[in-house]
């Protein structure tokens, strides 16, 4: 049995890796995609079985449902994640410009306020 870590030491956790290379805990969107894909495979496979009573074909439909739902969720989530990162970067750059130019003769707000008062 391993000794508990001391209060000052960080606790080491093993991360869950899927297929040996996809770190589910640290990769954005991976966990949700896998969970929704699993649910999609169960629904697709079981639904197909209820309609047709063909076991092998239902398993194939379940695997196909897993692949489609997982990839669909993955691409949707990664697209939104990338879009959010771009918006954050643009906002960060604008804040830096605002801080840099505030109160100087290069401040765009100062030019607008100065020209409207004349």
UniProtKB/Swiss-Prot annotation:
Residues 2-33, 78-118 are mitochondrial intermembrane. Changing residue 52 to P: In MC4DN11; reduced protein expression; defective mitochondrial respiratory chain complex IV assembly; decreased interaction with MT-CO2/COX2; increased interaction with TMEM177. Keywords: Acetylation, Disease variant, Membrane, Mitochondrion, Mitochondrion inner membrane, Primary mitochondrial disease, Transmembrane, Transmembrane helix. It is found in: Mitochondrion inner membrane. It is a multi-pass membrane protein. InterPro entries: Cox20 (IPR022533). Residues 52-60 are mitochondrial matrix. GO terms for cellular component: mitochondrial inner membrane; mitochondrion. GO terms for biological process: mitochondrial cytochrome c oxidase assembly. The modification N-acetylalanine is found at residue 2. The chain crosses the membrane at residues 34-51, 61-77. Found in a complex with TMEM177, COA6, MT-CO2/COX2, COX18, SCO1 and SCO2. Interacts with SCO1, SCO2 and COA6 in a MT-CO2/COX2- and COX18-dependent manner. Interacts with COX18 in a MT-CO2/COX2-dependent manner. Interacts with MT-CO2/COX2. Interacts with TMEM177. It is linked to Mitochondrial complex IV deficiency, nuclear type 11: An autosomal recessive mitochondrial disorder with onset in childhood or adolescence. MC4DN11 is characterized by walking difficulties, cerebellar ataxia, dystonia, choreoathetotic movements and dysarthria. Additional features may include sensory axonal neuropathy, cerebellar atrophy, and mild speech delay. Cognitive function is normal. Serum lactate levels are increased. Patient tissues show decreased levels and activity of mitochondrial respiratory complex IV. Belongs to the COX20 family. Essential for the assembly of the mitochondrial respiratory chain complex IV (CIV), also known as cytochrome c oxidase. Acts as a chaperone in the early steps of cytochrome c oxidase subunit II (MT-CO2/COX2) maturation, stabilizing the newly synthesized protein and presenting it to metallochaperones SCO1/2 which in turn facilitates the incorporation of the mature MT-CO2/COX2 into the assembling CIV holoenzyme. This is Cytochrome c oxidase assembly protein COX20, mitochondrial. The gene is COX20.
């Amino acid at each position: 049995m391993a000794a508990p870590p001391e209060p000052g030491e960080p606790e080491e956790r093993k991360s869950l890796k899927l297929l040996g290379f996809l770190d589910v805990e640290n990769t954005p969107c991976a966990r949700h995609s896998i969970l929704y894909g699993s649910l999609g495979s169960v629904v697709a496979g079981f639904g197909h079985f209820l309609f047709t009573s063909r076991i092998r074909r239902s398993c194939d439909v379940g695997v196909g449902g897993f692949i489609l739902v997982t990839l669909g969720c993955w691409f949707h989530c990664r697209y939104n994640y990338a879009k959010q990162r771009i918006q954050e970067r643009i906002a960060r750059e604008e804040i830096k410009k605002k801080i840099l130019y505030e109160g100087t003769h290069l401040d765009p707000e100062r030019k607008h306020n100065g020209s409207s008062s004349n």
